[in-house]
């Protein structure tokens, strides 16, 4: 048994992954690290060294003074660890450390191989300390687990148990300013570590931005670093009740820290931007900044409720900016796909607004961090409590300014042994569309649509990739002949467009039944982003019959984007909700999207998140409902200013009782929707049934105007029956 007291060795604990950064910080404070273990550094120094770490360490979790080691004389499998801990506690005279009138608490940690009921063992340590006091002075101290004057930290080991005085009291990450919390906040010392790793102070930024600020931790920690504010300046510590506490030394260190902070406040600070889509987070950030003592600096901090889609012009040209944020990863957002879309959208915004600037972004999975467009990226893995996180550091790559594919395409002479007519027609179509696509920035369009009877296929351009759909040939056509002709067409497509085979995706399109639109054709899941107007949209050219973006409704979506500002928008049979997305980006007061397919609603949410819009948020600005549209219209009462309905021609989904036929059922569908339309609102109705006729009852009840020609773009002029569309309003508006 060894009861020697060593007052010149200290343990400094930290979160896993911070050991290197913490060692650098401690050595900058003038203290040498003598030993390094996982989550713990050991230093040799004076009490002043320990106090300085308490005052100035932004990264440490605790500062522990080992005061008693209880060496085990023998160990065996049946050992009673709780009783060993009691024996170790009672064998030391604790009245040498603190007075019996002080309150205390026990924090017990057992090494991995030690099997012990920590709750019971903690009680036995408490009993040992109390019994030691009774033997020494005849009085016992009281337990206070919430605000003890003394905290004892006990490490249960394999060959010895170590009893420490916790000089920090509460964990050092508790700076005392966090009065208001948000979901899944990052600990203060981890936030500081990220800022230290990113060399915030050395970069001397003119702009500091946290676009998803939560409770404001990054902003406050950045303020503390840039104003030389000691993290321990205003918090309570665990040494005030310790007999060995040097009050004069501590007060002198405190005065020194206060003086340094006041001097640093005389220097100019960057402009801070703290944004969040949640008003509660914005409020929490403001209150926490005030609680941290930075109320006088609020004029330098723009704290606003903003989504990523609502960023202002930062005027960041020729300025040094620093971006740091903790996006709502994991359970706070939902599935992994939506998380990936969030990081893709954030990356695009950074590239546009802050090219060549430094950023540090937290991710829950490394795959999320990998989509960030950073030069020379570095990754730091940390533990935020029990959650592993990955921090990606790097310089933001400049945005790649792209033009529509046709803007750079040039017609070249193409000679084909066969399929020359097809090649000529495709080239003619592309030449005719080139000027329009370039002027209007059209990235996705139809290039060919069964123009020639012998080549019964559709060729669609999505960005710089082609989606080729072969219409199933009639039974009277020899399958081998049809296959040969299709292969000839593919060769002509490659020759005319200049695209290689990897950029061409092929499907065979048969007549749709009520469910096969939703049936997976493949499991490749090769989704990518295309641009349409202001919207970035995820498309999939492999997995489903449809791609996620109906090209023939482009003009309708752009029309909705122009008309949606300030309006409440309803999208029925919303598919991937691209019309809702355009409405949202066009400034709609709210969007509501209804579709029977959970698959497509999940895709819809990814589209919204990709564009910096919040989904499933408390303010219910953008809502998604997996429901039969007939029943949904019947059950609700909310009114909408703008409604878009694009129903299928026919549906017999298992989720839908009965069948839907657009010709048979459009009257009751439109009437139900008109009951949800405001008196001055507009409903757009469209469908792809070639034989569709609007019922006279609808024309008699409402103001009805067919606008088909206005909703078909130049790329579909060759197929005027691709869809039909109407504008419907309540009577008396025109």
Curated annotation (Swiss-Prot):
Positions of transmembrane segments: none
Superkingdom of origin: Bacteria
Main localisation: cytoplasm
Annotated Pfam families: Methyltrans_SAM (PF10672), RlmL_1st (PF22020), THUMP (PF02926), UPF0020 (PF01170)
E.C. designation(s): 2.1.1.173, 2.1.1.264
PROSITE patterns, per the entry: THUMP, UPF0020
Subcellular location as annotated: Cytoplasm
GO MF entries: 23S rRNA (guanine(2445)-N(2))-methyltransferase activity; RNA binding; rRNA (guanine-N7-)-methyltransferase activity
Gene3D superfamilies: 3.30.2130.30, RNA methyltransferase domain (HRMD) like, Vaccinia Virus protein VP39
GO CC list: cytoplasm
Class in the EC hierarchy, top level: transferase
Methyltransferase recorded as keyword: yes
Chemical reaction(s) catalysed: guanosine(2445) in 23S rRNA + S-adenosyl-L-methionine = N(2)-methylguanosine(2445) in 23S rRNA + S-adenosyl-L-homocysteine + H(+); guanosine(2069) in 23S rRNA + S-adenosyl-L-methionine = N(2)-methylguanosine(2069) in 23S rRNA + S-adenosyl-L-homocysteine + H(+)
Location of the THUMP domain: 49-167
UniProt KW keywords: Cytoplasm, Methyltransferase, RNA-binding, rRNA processing, S-adenosyl-L-methionine, Transferase
Entry keyword annotation includes S-adenosyl-L-methionine: yes
Coiled-coil boundaries: none
Family indicated by similarity: Belongs to the methyltransferase superfamily. RlmKL family.
Protein task: Specifically methylates the guanine in position 2445 (m2G2445) and the guanine in position 2069 (m7G2069) of 23S rRNA.
Protein name: Ribosomal RNA large subunit methyltransferase K/L
Organism listed in the record: Acinetobacter baumannii (strain ACICU)
